[in-house]
C-alpha cells in the first residue's frame, strides 16, 4: 500500500542511514514484464473455464476467483508503472489531485488482490474439506447457486473493505487489520487441516475409497497455499516492521528488501496458473487448446 509506505518514508530513510544494509533496487522493467505475464496467464485461466462447459463446476469457479485476485495484483503494478511514466514525462502534476485519486484506485486493486486471495484460498479449503469428508453429499451442499452467492458476498466484502482500507491507510488500526487478515486465514485453513487429519485417522478406510481426484485437489490446495505464504509473507512482515519499529536499524535492514518482497507478490500471479495446469489434466488440456487456437466449445 503506497500510502502506508509514504507515511513512513522519512523515518525509514533515517533508519537506513544507521544501517549497513543498502537498499535493493530492481529495474521497473522486471516488475512490468512479470505483471504482463501474470495478467495474460490468469486471463487464459478465466477464458478456459468460462469457454469449456466441462470446467464450469464450483471448484473451478473458486479457482477463477483466485485467478482474478492474482490478475488484480498484476494489474496494480502495470497501472502504477504507467502512472510513474506519465509523471516522469511531465503529463501529471506530482502530488496533484488526479495522481492522488489514481493512487487511491490503484492501491485499492492491491488490497483487493490480497483480500481476494485470502478468501479464495479459504473457500477452496472449505470446498476440499467437504469433498473429502462429505463426498456423497457434496453436490447437494456445494451447488452452483450457492457458489455464486458465496463468491458474490466475498467480492462485495473485499471491495468495500479494500476501499475503506485505502481511505484510512494512514491509521495504525488499518495497518493492523490489513496484516491480521493474513494470519487469520492461515489459522482458519490450519484448523481445517488439523480437523481433516484427525478425521482421516478415524476414517482411514473411508478415505481410501474416495476418488483420487478428491485427494489430488487437497494436495493442489496445499501447494497453492504454500506458494501464497512464500510470496506474500515477506511483504506483510515488511508492513508490520514499518508500523512498529520503523527507526530500528535491524528492521530497516529487512525493509531494504522492499522491492524484492514486491517482486515475490508479482511472481505469485505467474506461478499459480502453472500449478493449475500441472495438477489438473482438464485445465491443462483446455490451456493447450486455447494456446493452439483449437475449437473446443
Swiss-Prot record:
InterPro entries: ACTH_rcpt, GPCR_Rhodpsn, GPCR_Rhodpsn_7TM, Melcrt_ACTH_rcpt. Changing residue 21 to S: Significantly reduced ACTH binding. Changing residue 251 to S: Significantly reduced ACTH binding. GO terms for biological process: adenylate cyclase-activating G protein-coupled receptor signaling pathway; G protein-coupled receptor signaling pathway; G protein-coupled receptor signaling pathway, coupled to cyclic nucleotide second messenger; regulation of metabolic process. Glycans are attached at residues 12, 17. GO terms for cellular component: cytoplasm; plasma membrane. This is Adrenocorticotropic hormone receptor. The gene is MC2R.
